[in-house]
Amino acid sequence: VAFRDKVQAIIVFLDWAQTLNVAVIPYGGGSSVCGGVEAAVGDGFAGTISLDLERLNRVLEVDPVSRAARIQAGALGPELEAQLKPHQLTLRHFPQSFEFSTLGGWIVTRAGGHYATLHTHIDDFVEATRLVTPSGVMQTRRLPGSGAGPAPDRLVLGSEGTLGVLTEAWVRLQNPPRFRASASVTFSDYFTAAQCVRVLAQSGLNPSNCRLLDPLETVFSGVGNGSHAVLVLAFESADHPLQAWMARALELVSEYGGRYD
């Protein structure tokens, strides 16, 4: 296992590994269940080294006007949120492995999260990336949306560590929500509940959380006894109250037989 805390050190390290035909596996939080951090690289290499990025864990720069920050890829979810809090900003991206996974891991696996209904996946937050490869550094710039050819960041998103080592990224931030509205809705029929979720998704209400648990999952989650499906529905905003949005959502829920307190 190798540890590096500077980009230049990673550049030198990858150059050394390429010279000796050593496979390098970037390691963030290690929370993936897909085996991507295992040393299963075949017989074509002289060896394998895991490159642990835990020392690249700082928020390097904050742009409060544009609500964005340049963050190192090895920052765990709680680490980056703690550093953003003094600026009264948040990334508000919460995959299930939030405490144990890193910004870089989220980007290269195109992660979703518990509030990924309103802001879908990590893709929506990425403004620019810096990727160290055996052939050099690929660094994109923060630019307005453009239709001029392929977007280089799309090569990095979902790359799973196959193209190089993601060392940092500019990401869009949000103001912490001040207004919230939530409801837990039960359905006697799962497929009717699924139809209701589709209607909610197409309604334009844009809930921040709209998660449907099947009857068995409600038992594992501790929110039911296995006799009903449960829909977790939530809205949040840093700007305005949400009673009207929730009221309309519950009207739609009622049309599909959903029950709530």
List PLM regions with ranges.
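C-terminal substrate-recognition/cap domain of FAD-linked oxidoreductases
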Residues: 1, 175, 181-261
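Glycine-rich N-terminal segment of FAD-binding domains in flavoprotein oxidoreductases
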Residues: 1-54
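A glycine-rich phosphate-binding loop feature that marks nucleotide/adenosyl-phosphate handling sites
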Residues: 32-37, 97-104, 211-225
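Short, acidic (Asp/Glu-rich) active-site segment that either coordinates a divalent metal cofactor
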Residues: 33-37, 44, 48-53, 162-167, ...
